[in-house]
Amino acid sequence: MMAALSLLSGGRILMPPTVDTATEDFRIAPEAAKDDTDPSRFDSIIEEASALYGVNSALVKAVIQAESRFNPLAVSPVGAKGLMQLMPMIAKEYGAGDPLDAKQNVFAGVKYLSDLLDRYNGNVSLALAGYNAGPTAVRRFRGIPPYRETRGYVRKIQNLIAEGVRNAAVATADD
């Protein structure tokens, strides 16, 4: 896992926080049952947004997996929408007029994630905490907030990234 985090943070080793398990807090819009749920159908959008904003696509995919399980129509009980579960104010600020549109949502979410990575000097754990709990909470606690949900969220993303790196290594070895 450390190698994966090092790759995502420009070579710096980030120590993972002590965390509890994450909770999943989203509802699936009824229309989602008709939707194709193959995550690879979003690869081109993710790759394009990742390249544009300089964010590792593995990190973006892990965030999407944790946030919505690649359901572009996911809506949380608090109003977060789409693949990257953007809150209405963030969606508006980052140009996602329709946060349930996969492309608008991913581009806005990746830009927001890029801004958080810049704010925290490439520290992926702090950027993820900011994405989950908001930058105000990260500033107030001078680090990852002691919220169970946020600590679980950061750990979940780190585990998804590490799992993706392991799966890629296995696939490469099989080729």
Tell me what each language-model feature is.
Residues 1-65, 159-175:
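Cell-wall glycan-active module
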Residues 118, 122-125:
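Surface-exposed, polar/charged faces of alpha-helical domains
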Residues 127-175:
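Catalytic and substrate-binding regions of cell-wall glycan-acting enzymes that process beta-1,4-linked
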Residues 43, 47, 57-61, 103, ...:
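Short, well-structured alpha-helical segments
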Residues 29-37, 46-51, 72-77, 92-102, ...:
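Second-shell loop/turn segments in exported
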Residues 66-69, 89-91, 162:
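Solvent-exposed coil/turn segments that connect beta secondary-structure elements
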Residues 73-97, 105-117, 129, 135-136, ...:
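Substrate-binding/active-site groove segments that recognize
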